[in-house]
């Protein structure tokens, strides 16, 4: 990772001098990077997720944190309180009565906060899409970062979605809404 500085006057290609300096310092056990990159690296390695299980997808969501899949080896651990969570996983059918509660819990989460929509019902209403009491996708209530398809999606699919969220955070930094 190269660092651009204002004092770097290596001609047209300023990256050449910076890369040489980085290589020399790495040989001696030092690393040059930006603070934002370190914060994003730490954020992806310590995601705390909160479950918002509404229907059958919640069973698969519970499987993800069990020993067979062991999400904690990726730095992803469950939390019970929205005030300690970075990620909310919405799994299942979201009804009109439950939508204000979902928004309230989302608002209690600290910034930056991320949402994963898990399953067909959370993504777009699923089997109950035309019901009068169902919200046709939780993205109408809260902004969604990752969609995990399936009815119900497997624990592997949710784990893949969590890893994709980590990738998205590393690639884009803090997601500005």
UniProtKB/Swiss-Prot annotation:
Biological process terms in GO annotation: aerobic respiration; electron transport coupled proton transport
Sample GO molecular function, one term: iron ion binding
Cofactor binding remark: Binds 1 [4Fe-4S] cluster.
A GO cellular-component term linked to this record: plasma membrane
Keyword Iron-sulfur: yes
PROSITE patterns hit by this protein: COMPLEX1_20K
Coiled-coil stretches noted in the UniProt entry, renumbered to this chain: none
A Pfam match: Oxidored_q6
Cofactors, names only: [4Fe-4S] cluster
Record keywords: 4Fe-4S, Cell inner membrane, Cell membrane, Iron, Iron-sulfur, Membrane, Metal-binding, NAD, Quinone, Translocase, Transport, Ubiquinone
Main localisation: membrane
Its EC number(s): 7.1.1.-
Record's bilayer topology term: Peripheral membrane protein
Reaction catalysis annotation: a quinone + NADH + 5 H(+)(in) = a quinol + NAD(+) + 4 H(+)(out)
Positions with a binding annotation for [4Fe-4S] cluster: 56-57, 121, 151
Cell location: Cell inner membrane
Highest taxon in the source lineage: Bacteria
InterPro entries in alphabetical order: NADH_UbQ_OxRdtase-like_20kDa, NADH_UQ_OxRdtase_20Kd_su
Family of the protein in this entry: Belongs to the complex I 20 kDa subunit family.
Stated role: NDH-1 shuttles electrons from NADH, via FMN and iron-sulfur (Fe-S) centers, to quinones in the respiratory chain. Couples the redox reaction to proton translocation (for every two electrons transferred, four hydrogen ions are translocated across the cytoplasmic membrane), and thus conserves the redox energy in a proton gradient.
Quaternary structure and partners: NDH-1 is composed of 14 different subunits. Subunits NuoB, C, D, E, F, and G constitute the peripheral sector of the complex.
HAMAP family per UniProt: NDH1_NuoB
PANTHER family (UniProt xref): NADH DEHYDROGENASE, NADH DEHYDROGENASE [UBIQUINONE] IRON-SULFUR PROTEIN 7, MITOCHONDRIAL
Protein name as annotated: NADH-quinone oxidoreductase subunit B
Species of provenance: Ruegeria pomeroyi (strain ATCC 700808 / DSM 15171 / DSS-3)
Name of the gene: nuoB
């Amino acid at each position: 990772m190269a660092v651009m500085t204002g004092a770097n006057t290596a001609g047209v290609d300023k990256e050449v001098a910076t890369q040489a300096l980085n290589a020399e310092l790495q040989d001696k056990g030092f690393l040059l990077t930006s603070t934002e990159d370190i914060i994003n690296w730490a954020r992806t390695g310590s995601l705390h997720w909160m479950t918002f299980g509404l229907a059958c997808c919640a069973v698969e969501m519970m499987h993800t944190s069990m020993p067979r899949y062991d999400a904690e080896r990726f730095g992803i651990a469950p939390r019970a309180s929205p005030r300690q969570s970075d990620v909310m996983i919405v799994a299942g059918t979201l009804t009109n009565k439950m939508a204000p509660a979902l928004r309230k819990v989302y608002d209690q989460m600290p910034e930056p906060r991320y949402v994963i929509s898990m399953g067909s019902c959370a993504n777009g209403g699923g089997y109950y899409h035309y019901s009068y009491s169902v919200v046709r996708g939780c993205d109408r209530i809260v902004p969604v970062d990752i969609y995990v398809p399936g009815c119900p999606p497997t624990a592997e699919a949710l784990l893949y979605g969590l890893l994709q969220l980590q990738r998205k955070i590393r690639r884009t930094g803090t997601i500005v809404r």
